[in-house]
Amino acid sequence: MKIRMKQTVSMLLLTGFGLAAATEAFSAESLQDVMKRRNLSQQDLLAASKTYVPTGKRDEFMAFSSGGQSGQIIVYGIPSMRILKYLAVFTPEPWQGYGFDEESKAVLRQGNIDGKEINWGDTHHPAISETDGKYDGQFLFINDKANPRLAVIDLRDFETKQIVVNPIFKSEHGGAFVT
């Protein structure tokens, strides 16, 4: 038992020293060294710096991208292109609890058509709410291309609040437009 413990401690110490040496070698590298090692130009560095957002800082803009047949919306930051959130809309999402509590089940049931439960969608063409023709960022609307429905997402908490069925159409390939 003691021999095994000594071997384990020795291995951990050697690993620690190896990591420390490697970290020191990379941290001593200058910007010019990195540019040379990776064959980067000044233009490459400028392009990278235009999209870089340090940890803890916020992106200047957010984009709302339709998730297509996932029935979701993907929110990502610009310029970093980091995925900020997946918004559950027409499809239950077990990993975030959407469609598994009474509140979100009730929202999904609003999208039932002729009493038939439809727990899937094809999200396309999001639109942001406007006041006097200017974006106000209060709500996001998104079309379900496979079924005649539209969803309303509250941008204060990024949750789907309402699914509105269009009783006239059977399906639509339209989009959400705010007027």
Mark where each language-model region is.
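Structural signature of eukaryotic scaffold interfaces centered on beta-propeller domains
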Residues: K36-R58, Y98-D136, G175-T179
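Bacterial N-terminal signal peptides
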Residues: S10-A20
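Sequence/structural signature of beta-propeller modules
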Residues: L12, E24-V75, P79, K85-D101
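Structural hallmark of WD40 beta-propellers
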Residues: E60-A63, G137-F141
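Beta-propeller domains
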Residues: S66-Q110, I142-P167
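Long, well-ordered hydrophobic secondary-structure segments characteristic of membrane-embedded
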Residues: T131-D132, L140-D144
